[in-house]
A protein has these predicted regions:
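Alpha-helical scaffold segments in soluble metabolic enzymes
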Residues: 4, 26, 30, 138-141, ...
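Rossmann-fold NAD(P)-binding glycine/threonine-rich loop
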Residues: 1-10
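C-terminal active-site/capping subdomain that shapes the small-molecule cofactor and substrate pocket
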Residues: 114-212
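Residue-identity detector for glycine
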Residues: 14, 20, 31, 38-41, ...
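Arginine residue identity/basic-tract feature
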Residues: 6-7, 35, 51, 94, ...
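C-terminal and late-domain segments of enzyme folds
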Residues: 61, 65-154
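Conserved anion/nucleotide-ligand pocket segment
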Residues: 10-92
Length: 212
């Protein structure tokens, strides 16, 4: 893919849209990390009855999906930097094909966290959603942004459009570069890239100018 991109001077950006359960993880996990809330375990199960669910019945296909889902928490929580909080959490992901559910996907999460003095707590999330309804707007956004990247000499020369990682479970990055999965950092990078292209001041949220 990288070679094709270089050969054709075409932009590339990522794999596997971030629409359901992984979207929720990339919203919640940065909050835990920001408040230094520890994590003992995160159990995730999915019920879906569309073609995606049928394909994921195959162990080989599920393995690829599982790897992209599992990697998100480690990249966000950085257990090597915060071993007392995130150095030993258990992360399980299950996907169940259930034809009566059709395109209506259910993502259920049990999250075991702990706070000050190690006191355990739990969070339960039951996300009942529609797979295609969540994915379709991403397709529309990416058509527009990839067209912009193709027309922009500055972006086209990059090849990998890391600024579009906001939309993906597996964003593409330059070789050896740490992939960013925090949804809010991804959104800031997306907005600032667009502002940079327009020659506008980048968003920092510093806010000191309000108190001059």
């Amino acid at each position: 893919m990288h070679e094709l991109s270089r050969r054709n001077n075409a932009p590339i950006c990522g794999k596997d849209f971030k629409t359901g359960q992984t979207l929720i993880k990339t919203i919640l996990a940065p909050g835990f990390k920001a408040r230094m809330i520890g994590l003992n375990g995160w159990f995730s199960t999915n019920i879906l009855g569309n073609r995606d669910g049928e394909v994921l019945e195959d162990p080989g296909s599920f393995k690829t999906k599982e790897e992209s889902k599992l990697s998100v928490l480690e990249h966000i929580l950085q257990p090597e930097l915060y071993p007392d909080l995130y150095g030993n959490f258990t992360h399980k992901v299950r996907i169940n094909y259930y034809p009566p559910r059709g395109d209506n996907k259910e993502g259920w999460d049990n999250i075991d966290i702990f706070g000050w003095l190690g006191y355990p707590m739990q969070i339960k999330v039951d996300f009942l959603c529609r797979d295609s309804i969540l994915a379709a707007p991403i397709v529309l956004d990416l058509v527009l942004f990839m067209d912009l990247a193709q027309r922009s000499a500055e972006l086209r020369g990059l090849g990998i459009q890391e600024w579009l990682s906001f939309y993906f479970k597996s964003p593409m990055t330059a070789p050896g570069l740490y992939p960013e999965h925090d949804l809010f950092i991804q959104l800031m990078k997306l907005k600032n890239t667009l502002r940079h292209l327009r020659g506008e001041e980048l968003i920092t949220h510093l806010g000191l100018e309000y108190y001059d």
